[in-house]
Each structure stands twice: as C-alpha cells, then as structure tokens.
Amino acid sequence: MKRIFLFLFVALVGCGCTEQVQGERIEGPFLILSTPYYEDGSVNYENLVKEACFAAQWNTPGVIWPQSNDAIDLLTVEERLAGMAALVEEWKNNPKSTVLTLGVNGDDTEEMLMFAREAERMADESGVDFILAARPPYYGKTEQDIKEYYEALATVAKRPVIIQTYVNEDCPAPSAALLIDLAQRYPDVYGWIKEESNKLEANDRQQAELEGKPAVKTVFSAWGGWQWLYQRRQIGTAGLISEKIAYAPITSLVWQEMKKGENETCLTEAFAMYRLMIDQRFVIHDSLRGYGLYYLMRLGVFDNMLSRSYTVQPDYPNGSLAQEDKCKWTLTEFELSDMQKAELNKCYDDMMKFVNRHYKR
C-alpha cells in the first residue's frame, strides 16, 4: 500500500497537478504593491512586507511586486532582489492564501532571465509556491522580440506567469494571436493576461484574448479598474491588476459580489464606492501612488508619502528612455492640506462602513 501511495504521489507531482491547482486561484484582484521608502530614499522592506500583509488580511487573492514602472526602472537589481527575498521570507514564515507574485521584468531577455532564475532559486530554497509576472522587454521593438522573450522565459519558469501586455509606446503590445499561441504551447506557464491597452482598445483586445479559452485561463482588467465592472459583466474578465493596495477592503468586496453572478446584492454600489475612492479630483491626481500613500500612512502601513520620481522624462508621452537615464530619480513627497486630508478621511471611513456591512470575511 505504501508503494502504491508513493507511486501516486510521484505521478501527481510529475504531471504538474500542484501547479494546476495554483493556476485555478489566479483570478480576482491581484494588487500591485507600492514601494515604500525611508527619508534617505532607500527602500523600506519592512513596510513593503507590512503592505503585503495588509492585503492578505483582507483576503486579497494576489499581490504583485515589483511591477509598477518606478519599482522596476528606479530600483537597482540588488534592491529588487532584496524586496523579492523579503516577501518570500514572509510567505515562508507566515503562509497565506493570498498568492505572492514576483515581477521578473527585464530591459531585454538577458535581464529578464536573470530575475527569473533568481526567483526560481528562491522558490527552491524556500518552498514557497509563488507565481511570476512579466511585462514585455523595455527595449523590444517588434512582436518577434516579444515572442522570443516569452519563449525564453518559458524555458526557465516552473510556475504560472502573468503576461502584462504594455511596457511603453516604443514596444508594441503582443497580439492576441501571440498570447493565445503562447498559452497553447506552454499551458503550465502562460494563459494569464493583464490587458493594459488604453481605454476602449482594451475591450476589443480582451474579447479577442478570451477567444483563446481554455488555453487562456484568466484575462485581468487594468488601468486602475475604470472599466472593471463593464469588463467583468459584458466581456468576462476575471480580475483586476492595479496598484491599489490601500483599497483592498473594497476590492475584496467587489470581487465577492462579482463571484455571486446574478445573485449579487450590492455589486453596482460596491463598484461605485471603489470608483469614488480612486477618483478624488480635489487633490493632485496620480493614479498609481498619489493620495493612496496617505491612506497607507493612515493605516499604519507606511511611514511617509515619499516616492522616487523620474529625473528625466521621455521625448513624448510614455516613450522609452536611454538606459543611462531610465534609472535616474529624485526623492519627492506627496503633500496634502488639512482640508484635503479631512475629506479623504471621511471617504475612507464611509468606505469601511460600507465594507463592514456587506463583506463576509
């Protein structure tokens, strides 16, 4: 009997069934962690871990780091690896149902593979079953560049990878046909897509990508979730990827209601509350960090509202920067008046009252 059990166990591991179970959990809000800094501009890894734990406390399905531009471009290789290691250590010591996702983004294939190999090494040493995320190569120019980049990643990755479709205006977004082809040829690695095209273009692309089911498992909404409700109800997206950790309570409620389907009771109201929270226009509006940093401070997760900001700007919106300019940063602080803080506080308090009435923790 012991031999039979051992044979079945080896067979299950060998067929990748553990990864398949993991893959079934890759949906819902996968929130990108904002990078916290000390007063001297160095990365505050302790607060990074606290931020991830806050999301996990609200049953956020997944968290991702490093994935936003500033966390990729303005951090050194050593800083990115140190943050990844800190998060893996937290998941090792305090296992969570929230799926940890490590970004292995690279300027080119060589750099991406370095991060992917380091991530796999961390997985082997820690035993933590995290997944990966990767945007296209920063200096990619053609769809062939993108194809070769993701094919190379598939030779290293032993776990699911979420493909983010956008990096900058100089690198094209991978076509739906390419994304479907990758999902079909590498079913244990690809099939999870963060569709980050701008505005209405995203809707057309999401529909095309979902034509690739069942190889395509999940298409995530993006861009802060402005169209998340429409894209879920009318198109069939199954999650959101955005830098919105401070709003984990309301995103978890929205997802709870989305999963109910026709039995949902407050989905429209919950989504309206979420939209209110992320679209306050009486302050300087930054869709990624901005006043979300204030909420993280208010929650005791962050110590300040400091950010690394690009010193050099591209010649045109969302263009690429030369390698020597891409990593240059200055330390800036988001500032709010007492009146602005008072209104933000009132909004967050109202959000939490709504969440506490409707969310089943």
Protein language model features and the residues they cover:
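Sec-dependent signal peptide recognition
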Residues: 2-7
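Catalytic alpha/beta core domains of metabolic enzymes, predominantly
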Residues: 152-160, 167-288
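General structural feature for long, well-ordered alpha-helical segments within catalytic domains
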Residues: 44-47, 51, 79, 83, ...
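Residues that line or immediately flank small-molecule/substrate-binding pockets and catalytic motifs
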Residues: 8, 33, 67, 135-136, ...
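Active-site beta->alpha loop and helix N-cap motifs at the rims of alpha/beta catalytic domains
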Residues: 22-171, 314
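Structured C-terminal cap/extension of enzyme domains
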Residues: 46, 230-361
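Bacterial Sec-dependent signal peptides at the C-terminal "C-region" and cleavage site
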Residues: 8-23
